Amino acid sequence: MKSIGLNLSGREYKILIGSDLLSETATLLREAIPCDRVVVITNIDINRIYGKKLKKHLESKGIESLFLELPEGEIHKTLDMAAHIYPQLINHFAERNTPILALGGGVIGDLSGFVAATYQRGVPLIHLPTSLLSQVDSSIGGKVAVNHGGVKNIVGSFYQPRLVIADTGCLKTLPEKEFACGMAEIIKSAAIGSSELFRLLETNTQAVKDRSPEVMEDIVSQTAAIKASIVCQDETDRGIRNILNFGHTLGHALESTSSFSQSHGAAVAIGMCFAARLSVRLGLCENETALRLEKLIADFGLPTNPKDIDPDKIIEAMHHDKKVSDGRIRFILLKRPGEALIAENILKPDVLSVLEEMK
């Protein structure tokens, strides 16, 4: 098991990474929060695979658990779904010290975190991420949010978990599409933060695709450490943390304009290719860098170009991005593998030109 610590203005929590950690949940949980009752928020598919085993494990250690099973998908990450959860917490007599365990991927983590942040002004949150994307990205850093009015993550806050338990054994059961979505975030982290990880992915593509336990624990740990380091420098996303949104400016716009039928990982993959091409157009990086990134993305079965887009609608959606400042869209652009920068005052004709090129 590997442990990564986040120290945020005196508040510290750990990200624990290793195989079969779900079977140690009770012990690891009690080291962070003494408790004998928990609420587990999950979805139908994850509950079917892990719910019974986790419930039995918790009960064997004297921890009573209420499992709340939600429908699957980004479309359900809403205020209405949060409103559906609150009465169940009240009826279960969940108290301010009753932990909420988020068992699932990014949608479950975001929604559970939003509920934990707002129920009784905040209850303990524990992430049990089961998808690759959530293990390396969404469970780390305290962003919690729901979608509203067709805009992704527009209602939310920062609310740090008390603990993250990332069981890499869960990755064995991930469908190929979900695994590829997680790889988009790993490639993103390598592109902005580690030329060594970028090269590792290029030279060990098949071992990663085969989900070798040793390789997966290594790259999950490296990716989580990159994000943890950046979050510790800028918890509330006012500066350097913006670079974690490499690929997300276009990515979120693609998700929103597709009514969330476009998966997050696929959208971010396309967004990274767009950002790299825009970087080349602006003379910020070599064309070879963009080509290496596109090849790596394609090698993991992810798309590199959008389909059936309206560039004007895409730009309109970009103006809802949380990085927008004084009406100006901020883009995260690439200099070379392992180094990115935050750019403002990008001209609309340049953006449109790259979008047209990618159609």
Swiss-Prot record:
Organism (species): Dehalococcoides mccartyi (strain CBDB1)
Cofactor(s) listed in the protein's UniProt record: Co(2+); Zn(2+); NAD(+)
Q: State the pathway, as annotated in the record.
A: Metabolic intermediate biosynthesis; chorismate biosynthesis; chorismate from D-erythrose 4-phosphate and phosphoenolpyruvate: step 2/7
The superkingdom of the source organism is: Bacteria
- Where in or outside the cell is it found? Cytoplasm
Keywords for this protein: Amino-acid biosynthesis, Aromatic amino acid biosynthesis, Cobalt, Cytoplasm, Lyase, Metal-binding, NAD, Nucleotide-binding, Zinc
Job of this protein: Catalyzes the conversion of 3-deoxy-D-arabino-heptulosonate 7-phosphate (DAHP) to dehydroquinate (DHQ).
Record-listed Zn(2+) binding positions: E185, H248, H264
Protein known as: 3-dehydroquinate synthase
Coiled coil ranges (UniProt) are none
The catalysed reaction is: 7-phospho-2-dehydro-3-deoxy-D-arabino-heptonate = 3-dehydroquinate + phosphate
Q: How is its cofactor bound, per UniProt?
A: Binds 1 divalent metal cation per subunit. Can use either Co(2+) or Zn(2+).
GO CC annotation, single: cytoplasm
Q: Which GO terms describe its molecular function?
A: 3-dehydroquinate synthase activity; metal ion binding; nucleotide binding
One short Pfam family name for this protein? Answer: DHQ_synthase
Task: Offer one example of a GO biological process linked to this entry.
Answer: aromatic amino acid family biosynthetic process
Instruction: Give the family from UniProt.
Output: Belongs to the sugar phosphate cyclases superfamily. Dehydroquinate synthase family.
Q: Does GTP-binding appear among the keywords?
A: no
Where, in this chain's numbering, is NAD(+) bound? 72-77, 106-110, 130-131, 143, 152, 170-173
Top-tier EC class: lyase
Q: What's the Enzyme Commission number for this chain?
A: 4.2.3.4
